[in-house]
Regions:
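Charged helix-capping and loop-helix junction motifs
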Residues: 30, 134-137, 164-165, 214-221
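Catalytic core of bacterial c-di-GMP phosphodiesterases, primarily the EAL and HD-GYP domains
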Residues: 14, 90-164, 238
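C-di-GMP signaling machinery
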Residues: 1-47, 55, 74, 82-89, ...
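Short beta-strand edge/capping elements of PAS-family sensory modules
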Residues: 60-63, 147
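Cytosolic catalytic headpiece of P-type ATPases
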Residues: 64, 75-78
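EAL-family c-di-GMP phosphodiesterase catalytic domain
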Residues: 19-23, 53-58, 68-72, 124-127, ...
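Aromatic/hydrophobic pocket-lining residues that form π-stacking "cages" and hydrophobic walls in ligand
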Residues: 2, 100, 223
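Surface-exposed amphipathic alpha-helices with a cationic face
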Residues: 105, 142, 164-174, 221-228, ...
Length: 295
């Protein structure tokens, strides 16, 4: 591996074996065959991560998260990396839509998700399906098309033409768009103006510790105020503590997601009465404090 690395770096330089780099990059050498097997056999499952409505304290929807069934790929990002270097992103995009929606369909039939729940799909930002595959998706999922929420990520690698084309399709089928990782660093304000999403997912980097950081709390509050003028919902992503939950509710967010409520699972999470009660109690407390002018 060290010989391979130095051959592909600056001529005449000296390289030492780097175990961290080896762990990260060795999969690029060994993973192609495994990736092809996964694609050919459609060996991908989708875990669902619950999204909760602040207003009701109940399930609003679920984010579908890729889980390749493989000992080689320990993390989904490794699978995406190898697919990108192998020019196989289109196949991953197609399988994501096909298998995630199939999974959601099965849960609906088994009565495992609440009626009206949304399914959030992470689409690859620089990839778009052709008309044939889109028609197949529509035909196989005609009864749940309006349950779809397309998650888009505005980044340097994103193809803006593809992103807007996907949004047009989503609008035509009566579905919704969510802007993912808002505030993570790449031109978020511009993306908000140009993409006009139905939902904004505030990045975990802002939510983390917002109960102890007045600056973060101010950002969340101002974003909620801006979103309200555009009829856009705000989702707090990565809520991990009760203190963070209390603060984002005080800031006025509409939707919640994070390990505080539960981790992604192959069995869709349901809100317990205790969880619903906690959220609604915090809402009442926040309203009382607003009325008293303390927040």
């Amino acid at each position: 591996f060290a010989m391979y690395t130095i051959k592909h770096s600056t001529k005449g330089s000296i390289a030492e074996f780097d175990i961290t780099k080896y762990t990260k990059d060795s999969i690029l050498i060994t993973g192609v065959e495994e990736m092809n097997r996964i694609i050919d056999t459609e060996s991908i499952k989708y875990a669902l991560h619950a999204i909760i409505s602040v207003r009701t304290g109940r399930i609003y929807g679920y984010e579908a998260l890729m889980r390749p069934q493989s000992e080689v790929f320990k993390a989904p990002l490794d699978f995406i990396r190898i697919a990108k270097t192998s020019a196989k992103l289109y196949e991953i995009e197609r399988l994501t839509w096909k298998l995630a929606l199939r999974t959601f369909h099965e849960y609906i039939k088994e009565g495992m998700v609440p009626q009206g729940a949304k399914i959030f799909i992470n689409s690859i930002s620089n990839c778009i399906m052709d008309a044939k595959d889109i028609s197949e998706i529509e035909r196989e999922n005609k009864d749940i098309l309006n349950s779809i929420v397309l998650e888009v990520l505005e980044s340097e690698e994103a193809n803006s033409e593809y992103v807007h084309a996907k949004q047009e399709w989503i609008s035509c089928i009566g579905a919704m768009t969510a802007l993912d990782d808002f505030g993570s660093g790449y031109n978020s304000e511009y993306a908000l103006l140009t993409l006009k999403p139905d939902i904004i997912k505030i990045d975990r980097s802002i939510i983390s510790g917002c109960d102890r950081d007045e600056g973060k709390a101010d950002i969340i509050t101002k974003l909620v105020q801006i979103a309200a003028t555009k009829n856009t919902l705000v989702l707090a992503e990565g809520v991990e503590t009760r203190e963070e939950l209390k603060k984002v509710i005080e800031c006025g967010v509409d939707l919640l997601q994070g390990f505080y409520f539960g981790k992604p699972s192959f069995e869709p999470m349901k809100c317990t009465e205790q969880m619903t009660g906690e959220i609604l109690d915090l809402c009442v407390e926040a309203e009382r404090e607003r009325a008293n002018g303390t927040i």
